């Protein structure tokens, strides 16, 4: 059994967490972009981002394992160098390019809690995860703001036990059905759904599929003192349902309400400019591009 990671800071249990930042394609603000991160900070939200590796091992802030959905390029992210990826424009962004984790850490600079997802590199939630966790740990050594790392793949977190013992680590979890996880063996899916990796990893929290929060395994994790976040609510109604069991929500597709006493947040800036060309978050529903609806 690994030693328990530090508890999730209270900052993650206050303001709702913007899924891939506060993105709105109609305004030219793309998921996991610098603009989406800035918008989330200005609105007083926490931030969730995704990490994929470049060919050189650098940690890139990008959700998909291929470039096709969000850029004019094609092919695997891991086949391009960080330098090359940093020159690729995100579509409909007005020229924004793919950022590195180091750039996003410098941008956030402790002004909002930052939840970092390590994307699965094995393809079936197995042990072949590469050195991405080590690179993330290296980048977080000097970071002073509220930060936590999580993954669907327990193996992706294993290197952090020794490499980043002061960083809270958690598992992203769900019901792990065969329909959604066809490459994962049935026995392994059952173990993942039962949250059997929590104790061996010393995980301090989970981020669970919101529709499955009443799972006995989730209730047991909460009773054991682990924080329970959830993903991904897309309306005030879904948020109300999720909050009956979850300590906080990851959201997109609308503007979640920020509690006035939310811990760990910078004071929200005035509402962004709603004029044409400005970010009109306060004037109309937040919209997202078509894409994966998972975490």
Descriptions of predicted regions:
Residues 1-295:
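Phosphate-group recognition and catalysis centered on beta-loop-alpha active-site segments
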